Design a protein with these regions (language model features):
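Conserved ABC ATPase "signature" region
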Residues: 122-137
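H-loop/switch region of ABC-family ATPase nucleotide-binding domains
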Residues: 201-202
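Conserved ABC ATPase signature
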Residues: 141-145, 149
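Helix-to-loop junction immediately C-terminal to a conserved catalytic motif
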Residues: 69
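A short, surface-exposed alpha-helical micro-motif characterized by mixed small hydrophobic
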Residues: 207-209
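Catalytic Walker B motif of ABC-type/P-loop ATPase nucleotide-binding domains
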Residues: 166-169
């Protein structure tokens, strides 16, 4: 798959205005009843790179992404996207889930639906589908795509908005190895073009390949956050060490 987006000048569709990064999260709490599933999360993300969010099951990774994206509201705490208004921030983000969310239409129509709201054209749609290796399936119903193809289409829909920040919630969890590498290549190309990536994964090998920095969550808190180059060889928290060594983290 070629990086057609980088080569096609028609694809500069990012929303105008001041950047929404850096991001500052302070004392973020999310409660369900009496249970704090996120408990005092404080986090800073700069304007570039790929942040991988890791941690054991139930540590709050997916919930944190949904809060940052604005799909959920915290019980308390602040999420500051460089002082931008929530509506402006939402327009500059995209979120891809583990299970692709697609229209029951053709592959091309799935892209057109997004582009119509953004003033895009057929040249942009063609470039997006070529970029994710689906140009030859433009007229096919999306429901007939394989799991890997469907996730690539979901990524193309996300990239159609030219997001400043791309959130990915375990997008390769149920895919075969070839599809995993294809998704990683698409995400890597987006990162290289300047899109800020926040990527949840349980796959340690994938995290090593993708991460510039790692946020490790444990019991709803940030147990560790630092450069990937230091985290993987020498994690500072006991929970992260156990996790990386394949031990059960409680």
């Amino acid at each position: 798959m070629r990086d057609t987006l980088a080569m096609t000048s028609a694809l500069t569709g990012r929303a105008p205005g001041s950047p929404i990064l850096p991001l500052a999260v302070r004392d973020l709490v999310l409660r369900f009843g009496d249970t704090a599933v996120l408990d005092g999360v404080t986090l800073d993300l700069g304007p570039a790179g790929c942040t991988v969010v890791m941690g054991p099951n139930g540590s709050g990774k997916s919930l944190l992404l949904k809060l940052l994206h604005g799909l959920m509201r915290p019980t308390s705490g602040t999420i500051d996207w460089a002082g931008r208004a929530p509506a402006e921030v939402t327009a500059r983000q995209a979120l891809v889930f583990q299970k692709p969310v697609l229209l029951r239409r053709s592959v091309a129509a799935n892209i057109d639906f997004v582009l119509k709201a953004r003033g895009g054209d057929r040249a942009r749609r063609a470039a997006l589908l070529d970029h994710v290796g689906l140009a030859h399936k433009a007229g096919q119903p999306a429901r007939l795509l394989s799991g890997g193809e469907a996730q690539r289409l979901a990524l193309a829909r996300a990239l159609a908005t030219d997001p400043e920040v791309l959130f990915l919630d375990e997008p390769t969890a149920s895919l075969d190895p070839a599809s995993v590498l294809a998704i990683e290549a698409i995400v890597g190309a987006a990162r290289a073009r300047g899109t800020r990536i926040v990527f949840v994964t349980h796959d340690i090998g994938q995290a090593r390949r993708m991460a510039d920095d790692v946020v490790f969550l444990h019991r709803g808190r940030v147990a560790e956050h630092g450069p990937a180059a230091g985290f993987f060889p020498e994690p500072q928290s006991a929970a992260a060490r156990d996790y990386l060594n394949g031990r059960i983290v409680v």
